[in-house]
Amino acid sequence: MNSTEITQNTDVPSHFRSIKTFVLRTGRMTEGQKRNYEAFYQKWCIPYTESPIDFQTLFQNDNPVIIEIGFGMGTATAQIAEDNPDKNYLGIEVFKAGVGKLLGEIEEKKLNNLRIIEHDAIEVLENMINNESVDGFHIFFPDPWQKKRNHKRRLVRRPRTDLLSKKLKDGGYIYMVTDWENYAEDAFEQLSETPNLKSKYEKFAPSQSWRPTTKFEKKGLKKEHVINELIFEKD
C-alpha cells in the first residue's frame, strides 16, 4: 500500500461514523425505475466493498474523476456527464428510486463516463476511494438539517470535510450549492477551517453556467430562497 492509498476507517472518528447525514426514506419506485434497476444495475453500478477502486481500470482511461455525493434523481448528473465526455463521474446515492432513474439515463445516453455506488457516501469514501485520487466533489442541495441539534448531521461539516480534503488531489475542488443561507454560512466556515482547503472566491461563488438547474433548486427558488454556491480548492 503506497502513501496515497486508503487506511480503512481512520479518517472519521468512530463516534461520528454512527451519525448519518441522511434519512433513508422508503419511497416507492416507479415501474420504469424498477425495470432500470433490475436491468442495468450490474452494468453501471459498483457494489460496495471495503477494497479501493482503481479508477483507471474502472473507466479504462486516466481522465479526471469527479464524485457527486447525493445525486437525487440524477438528471443534472447525467447532463453534466454528457456535456463533459473527457471527465469521469461517480455518483453516490442511497435512494433506490434515484438510482433507478439515473440508470435509465446512463443506458439511454450511453454514458460510459458515469458509474453509481448505492451506499452511504462516508463509508464509500473511507473504504473505496484512495487518498489524493479525486479531482472534484459535487454536493448539490444536501439535506440542510435545519434544527441546531441536527447540524452535526450535515455532510459539509468537520470532520467529514477533512475526509473530502484527504481524498482530493492537489488542485482538486469541492463545489457545494445550497438554498439554505444558514447552511451556506456554516459550510463556508467549516470548509475554511479544513486543512489544505481555500475558497476560490472571497466568499460565495458566482453561479456556474455549466451546472444544470436541479429539482431542489427550482423548489428553493419558488420559496424565494437565495441560492448560494461555494467552491473550495485544495492547495
Curated annotation (Swiss-Prot):
Binding site for substrate: 147, 179, 214-217
Pathway stated in the Swiss-Prot or TrEMBL entry: tRNA modification; N(7)-methylguanine-tRNA biosynthesis
Keywords, sorted A to Z: Methyltransferase, S-adenosyl-L-methionine, Transferase, tRNA processing
InterPro entries documented for this protein: SAM-dependent_MTases_sf, tRNA_(Gua-N-7)_MeTrfase_Trmb, tRNA_methyltr_TrmB_bact
GO (cellular component) term, any one: tRNA methyltransferase complex
A Pfam family this chain is assigned to: Methyltransf_4
Uppermost EC category: transferase
Residues at which S-adenosyl-L-methionine binds: 68, 93, 120, 143
Catalytic activity: guanosine(46) in tRNA + S-adenosyl-L-methionine = N(7)-methylguanosine(46) in tRNA + S-adenosyl-L-homocysteine
Active site: 143
Alphabetized Gene3D superfamilies for the sequence: Vaccinia Virus protein VP39
EC number(s) stated in the UniProt entry for this protein: 2.1.1.33
Molecular function GO labels: tRNA (guanine(46)-N7)-methyltransferase activity
CDD domains associated with the record: AdoMet_MTases
Signal sequence annotation: none
Family: Belongs to the class I-like SAM-binding methyltransferase superfamily. TrmB family.
Task performed by this protein: Catalyzes the formation of N(7)-methylguanine at position 46 (m7G46) in tRNA.
HAMAP family xrefs: tRNA_methyltr_TrmB (MF_01057)
Protein name per the record: tRNA (guanine-N(7)-)-methyltransferase
